[in-house]
A protein has these predicted regions:
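Catalytic cores and adjacent flexible loops of soluble metabolic enzymes
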Residues: 1-289
Length: 289
């Protein structure tokens, strides 16, 4: 029997700037059946500049087009002073809490909180110094691949291994918000594991739960999905985030998918043996006089 797939509730910007909402989101993730909750650790001034030049305006055919990068990140970030309490609440709830650091100062802050896992976000997968620094802490590393080429993935995996860190999970991801299901290419989950000799999984931006269910059949060891208390609260990520009721159903569906996979065996189950006893048998007969 394969190991259980870890289900991660990605909070991202879905606290909408309110610490009370962030805390309740952690508690709701537990109620919905998540195994872990993930934060993002950055500040606008650590990853971009406040600048009105064209290169600093989002123009990628996304739901955020027309906004300045600085303004979006300023709206979306999780204040660093919240992190300790959020980690504490998650621990109270029996959840693993980890984060995506976007620079070395974020790694340092998370180390002070004994962050148990580091995830490198899709847009940071070419930041080899960041990957090396996080990997050097010898915690499990998760790499998202939403904009990555094969070479990008290879270099990122090699960066982890150079630091003596071989606990690597590579997530299939499509950095489109929401992502069209026809671009999910979930068959890559199995290929990622085989090609790079790592664990693999899914960071999902499609709508609904079809992709997570299919991901399990492709050997996913981790499934991450954006999670929100209620889409009506708004925020940068609300349109492609899953509410508690739907997330809970997704968790049940994923567990059922795992259960249905079972194991490779030709032994008959008890039910099969019972049915076999009712099967037709060869009969010979002779004419009676």
């Amino acid at each position: 029997m394969r190991d259980k797939c870890m289900i991660v509730a990605e909070m991202s910007a879905n606290h909408n700037g309110k610490k009370e909402t962030a805390i309740e989101t952690v508690r709701a993730a537990k109620r919905a059946g998540a195994d872990a909750v993930k934060l993002q650790t950055y500040r606008a001034d650590t990853i971009t500049l406040r600048c009105d030049k064209p290169d600093f305006i989002i123009n990628e055919g996304s739901i955020w087009d027309g906004q300045y990068f600085y303004d979006l990140y300023e709206q979306a970030y999780t204040p660093w002073e919240w992190h300790e309490e959020l980690f504490h609440v998650a621990k109270e709830e029996g959840l693993i809490c980890f984060s995506s650091p976007f620079d070395k100062t974020a790694v340092d802050m998370l180390e002070a909180l004994d962050c148990p896992v580091y995830k490198i976000a899709s847009f940071e997968i070419t930041d080899i110094p960041l990957i090396e620094y996080a990997a050097s802490k010898h915690k499990p590393m998760v790499l998202a691949t939403g904009i990555a080429t094969e070479e990008d993935i290879q270099l990122a995996v090699e960066a982890c291994r150079r630091m003596g860190n071989n606990d690597i999970t590579v997530l299939k991801c499509t950095s489109s918000y929401p992502a069209p299901v026809e671009e999910a290419n979930l068959c890559m989950i199995r290929d990622l594991a085989e090609r790079f000799q790592v664990k693999s999984g899914l960071s999902d931006h499609t709508l609904g739960s079809v992709s997570p269910i299919v991901a399990v059949t492709q050997g996913a060891s981790m499934i991450e999905k954006h999670f929100i208390l209620n889409r009506s609260i708004g925020g940068p990520d609300c349109s492609f985030s899953m509410e508690e009721k739907d997330f809970a159903q997704m968790v049940k569906d994923v567990l059922m998918a795992e259960l249905s996979l079972g194991k490779t065996t030709y032994e008959l189950t008890e039910k099969m043996r019972g049915s076999r006893s009712a099967s037709r048998s060869p009969v010979s007969y002779t004419h009676l006089r």
